[in-house]
């Protein structure tokens, strides 16, 4: 039970049958949707079905249970009243509203006023039918005022309760949220909703950068993040979410290291799809690294840095991503035509420098290998064994080179030895373990002999 579920249980226990709020409090929006999908709550929004109910309820909770409820906090512009519920030393923000209708100016964006209404009218102003569901906290009954919300949820359909252009004009971020739901929840957008997004995408310029950043951070957790970025690019929303990125995705030129006909965005999109499909819980940091790596490789790190700055992901994450980009370039410099050309022990030192990021880096390298020409693919298998053979081979090459020079002949080229196969790597690992065991056995034998000699000297 997470903090939202604990807070909801606390509220439910405090609303007795003789309370004026009994039967008037509804769980609303994404909370009901996630519950029906069998997922945990990620926020807590309540609707109080009475005029000024949000103020009355929060004020009553804070006055009646001051040790657990802190507030109230008023947000006059949106007609919202909130409170902090503290349970087990964990604080949860609970936002409360009344069912209301919003009146906008002629531009469809400027909010003029809000007024109390019925649940049916309140449902018509919400973004999608699957989010226009209400659960009565007292009875547990789920109400579907649009008559389509539960059915659309079962079929994974994102449809607006009212005319899509009107819904998106009131809050343009709803367009971005629809694409996020599509790739985060596995839903599909209604055709009318998608056409409205194509028509209304310029309205996104009116949205605050903070809300756009929050939606991007949520989309980074999607299993089909690469396809989500592609949908944002096609719809025109990407220009507002990550300004500048569209300029590079629209470049149809051949990627210099890829197979014929593969552009920069085709390679990046494929790598993201492979990474998210094979490892659904990949860290957002690695996804962002793959997103800008080809751009940094072809157009320079300054271009990638500018895109990350436009995405407002934070200075620390930007530094980490650029560091991973540099590490990838360094790893690639160890190989030429799939042959190791680095200095002795350089690869071992590189793997140690990766630290806990080694597995994530290996997965990224493997994903980026897709659609690269064979000679440009990098051996991600080396990250399975830190005592990789190039170190030993180069030590042998150096000894051979010195011997060859003494005999008046030139040293063999480093690039003449092929990269080892996975079977050879496994054999090398077994031989290494065998040598280590022999060494330890010999050390124990010498220690026992020393102990016996010490005991004999004491007896004398």
How should each PLM-predicted stretch be described?
Residues 1-460:
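Catalytic cores of the polymerase beta-like nucleotidyltransferase superfamily
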């Amino acid at each position: 039970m997470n903090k939202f579920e604990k807070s909801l249980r606390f509220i439910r226990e405090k609303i007795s049958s003789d309370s004026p709020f009994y039967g008037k409090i509804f769980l609303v929006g994404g909370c009901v949707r996630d519950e029906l999908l069998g997922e945990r709550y990620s926020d807590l929004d309540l609707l109080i079905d009475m005029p000024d109910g949000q103020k009355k309820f929060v004020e009553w909770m804070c006055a009646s249970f001051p040790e657990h409820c802190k507030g109230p906090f008023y947000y006059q512009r949106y007609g919202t009243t909130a409170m902090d519920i503290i349970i087990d030393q964990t604080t949860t923000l609970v936002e409360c509203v009344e069912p209301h209708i919003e009146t906008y100016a002629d531009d469809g964006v400027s909010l003029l006023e809000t007024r109390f209404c019925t649940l049916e009218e309140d449902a018509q102003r919400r973004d999608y039918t699957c989010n226009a569901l209400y659960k009565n906290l007292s009875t547990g009954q789920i109400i579907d005022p649009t008559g389509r919300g539960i059915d659309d949820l079962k079929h994974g359909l994102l449809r607006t309760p009212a005319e899509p252009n009107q819904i998106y004009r009131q809050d343009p971020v709803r367009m971005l949220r629809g694409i996020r739901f599509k790739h985060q929840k596995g839903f599909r957008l209604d055709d009318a909703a998608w056409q409205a997004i194509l028509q209304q995408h310029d309205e996104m310029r009116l949205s605050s950068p903070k809300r756009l950043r929050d939606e991007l951070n949520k989309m980074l957790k999607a299993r089909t993040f690469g396809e989500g970025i592609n949908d944002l690019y096609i719809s025109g929303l990407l220009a507002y979410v990550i300004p500048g990125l569209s300029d590079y995705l629209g470049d149809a030129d051949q990627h210099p290291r890829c197979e014929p006909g593969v552009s920069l965005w085709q390679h990046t999109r494929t790598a993201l799809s492979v990474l998210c499909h094979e490892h659904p819980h990949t860290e957002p940091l690695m996804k962002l690294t793959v997103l800008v790596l080809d751009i940094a490789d072809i157009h320079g790190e300054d271009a990638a840095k500018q895109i990350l700055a436009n995405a407002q992901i934070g200075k620390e994450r930007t530094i980490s991503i650029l560091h991973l980009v540099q590490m990838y370039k360094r790893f690639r410099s160890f190989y030429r035509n799939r042959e190791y050309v680095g200095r002795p022990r350089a690869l071992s030192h590189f793997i140690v420098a990766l630290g806990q990021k080694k597995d994530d880096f290996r997965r990224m390298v493997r994903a980026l290998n897709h659609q690269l020409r064979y000679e440009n693919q990098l051996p991600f298998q080396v990250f399975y064994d830190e005592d990789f053979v190039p170190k030993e081979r180069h030590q042998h090459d150096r000894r051979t080179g010195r011997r060859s020079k003494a005999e008046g002949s030139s040293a063999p080229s480093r690039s003449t030895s092929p990269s080892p196969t996975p079977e050879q790597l496994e054999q090398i690992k077994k031989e290494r373990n065998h040598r280590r065991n022999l060494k330890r056995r010999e050390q124990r034998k010498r220690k026992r002999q020393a102990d016996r000699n010490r005991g004999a000297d004491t007896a004398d």
